[in-house]
């Protein structure tokens, strides 16, 4: 029985093997056809490449729309305008203003102070000057610029004066102002009961119209105002016409500020006197004031230089000097120097007065009154 079962099993197994052979070949061919490039190819053989058709999908090509170009009508050319000439305006020739008027120009840079040399011998002086000022051709009549002549006195016109005649007096004089420090200087004088003399310009460190209140206060408090020319010009380089114009222009500005009065005292910038200057000043009725004590505050306009200016003042007093040259345009002069000079004057038993007072000239003669 067992033998028969074994025989049947072997026979069935062989039959299955025989039946499976054609099925395996057909299955292999089907796999190859479905999966090209893979098994049963040898791993060292190159695999065939079968690109996929239409991959990636092609982009659709839509036809571009055709838009007709707009046809705008061309603008017609505008007619050319023919300019018409307007009649020229009638011009009136300018005339030089009189009285109060602003100066022609306002300086934007602080001018350089040119030192004034004061000799050491008395009473005569040898002035020095260096700046160059071109003479002006503007015609100005000779004689007294405006107003009536001053009252008769003993002080000569057109003569350089550099020494006081009244004993016990000292004249502190200030050139080139008014400026920012002139007002505080008046406060110092008021505190000490002293008077000063101011030789002013219209255009130098500042515009005199900007300091009209200071000028008016100076006049009201009894200080003396003198002319230092309109623009700080070197009068020795001008003719008589140019000299007269410099004096007249300043007088025309000062007069409305000080009740219509005009100074009769003057000081030439740089102490630049000449025969022409003296002759012209005699015709214009001006007293010419120099100095015989020079503090040289313009050379020592720093706190460290103030002791040098004080020493110069003391040496001038010991040499017999009485008219002192200072400048109210320097801050150190006003804030540090002047009080020391006033203290030295009091210490020596002297009085600080105006030039007119130290010459014995009445105050009525200091100005030319208005007509």
Swiss-Prot record:
Region (Disordered): 73-112
Catalytic activity: [(1->4)-N-acetyl-beta-D-glucosaminyl](n) + n H2O = chitosan + n acetate
Record-linked Pfam families: Polysacc_deac_1
Binding site for acetate: 175, 270
Cleavable signal peptide: 1-20
Site (May prevent de-N-acetylated sugar residues from interacting with the active site): 296
Ranges of compositional bias, category Low complexity: 79-89, 102-112
Record bears the keyword Transit peptide: no
Protein name: Chitin deacetylase
Biological source species: Arthroderma benhamiae (strain ATCC MYA-4681 / CBS 112371)
């Amino acid at each position: 029985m067992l033998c028969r079962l074994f025989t049947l099993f072997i026979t069935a197994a062989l039959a299955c093997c025989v039946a499976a052979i054609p099925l395996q070949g057909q299955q292999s061919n089907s796999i190859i056809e479905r999966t090209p490039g893979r098994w049963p190819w040898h791993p060292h053989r190159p695999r065939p490449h079968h690109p996929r058709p239409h991959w990636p999908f092609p982009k659709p090509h839509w036809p571009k729309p055709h838009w007709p170009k707009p046809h705008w009508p061309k603008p017609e050319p505008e007619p050319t305008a023919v300019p018409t000439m307007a009649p020229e305006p009638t011009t009136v020739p300018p005339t030089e203003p009189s009285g109060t008027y602003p100066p022609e120009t306002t300086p934007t840079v602080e001018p350089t102070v040119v030192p004034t040399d004061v000799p050491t011998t008395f009473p005569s002086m040898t002035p020095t000057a260096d700046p160059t000022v071109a003479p002006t051709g503007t015609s100005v009549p000779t004689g007294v610029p405006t107003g009536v002549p001053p009252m008769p006195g003993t002080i000569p016109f057109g003569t350089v004066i550099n020494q006081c005649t009244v004993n016990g007096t000292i004249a502190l004089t200030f050139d080139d102002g008014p400026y920012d420090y002139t007002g505080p200087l008046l406060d110092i004088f008021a505190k000490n009961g002293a008077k000063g003399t101011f030789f002013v310009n219209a255009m130098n460190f500042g515009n005199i119209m900007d300091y009209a209140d200071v000028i008016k206060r100076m006049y009201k408090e009894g200080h003396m105002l003198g002319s230092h020319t309109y623009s700080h010009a070197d009068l020795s380089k001008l003719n008589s016409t140019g000299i007269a114009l410099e004096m007249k222009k300043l007088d025309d500005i000062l007069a409305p500020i000080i009740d219509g009065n005009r100074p009769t005292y003057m000081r030439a910038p740089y102490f630049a006197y000449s025969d022409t200057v003296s002759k012209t000043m005699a015709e214009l009725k001006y007293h010419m004031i120099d100095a015989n004590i020079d503090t040289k505050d313009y050379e020592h306009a720093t706190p460290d230089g103030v002791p040098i200016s004080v020493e110069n003042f003391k040496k001038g007093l010991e040499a017999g000097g009485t008219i002192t040259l200072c400048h109210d345009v320097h801050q150190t002069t006003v804030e540090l120097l002047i009080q020391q000079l006033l203290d030295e004057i009091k210490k020596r038993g002297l009085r600080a007065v105006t030039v007119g007072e130290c010459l014995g000239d009445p105050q009525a003669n200091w100005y030319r009154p208005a007509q």
